[in-house]
Amino acid sequence: MDETYDLIVIGGGPAGISAARLAAAKGKRTLILEKEGWGGTCTHRGCIPTKALLTCSKSYSDLKKFKRLGIRTGEAAIDFGAVKKHQQQIVRVAALGAEKTLADAGVDIRIGEGEILSASEVRYTDAGGAAQTLKTSHILIAW
């Protein structure tokens, strides 16, 4: 298989995903490398998991207010294990959505690390430690 690309993007967060999709849409052979998971910090440790927790918190708070409105719901309780599971599921769905978006756009995707060797070479190392040198016309660092 030819391992030469028009563009190699290092970083699978929102900026990297957008750049890779745009390049592929313009007919460029594009590869995106991501070390941890598609979607970057926002998806895995920032916006999305935080919003999932806030949604649970708001729902619990709303239940407490219902009593004043004459609505009886019984005693509300928080199951932190279930809340965490909900949060993880939301993150998983978002990451899978990002991966599908890339694949549907025709972007080659790999989980692993990218190391710039020169202006036209990137070393890709997968989770098992196997390394491969890839050639490219352009490199975009999107951390």
For the regions a language model picked out, list residue spans one by one:
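Glycine-rich flavin
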Residues: 2-5, 21-28, 33-143
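Beta1/beta-strand and adjacent pyrophosphate-binding region of the FAD-binding site
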Residues: 1-15
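Short alpha-helical segment within the catalytic ATP-binding CA
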Residues: 18
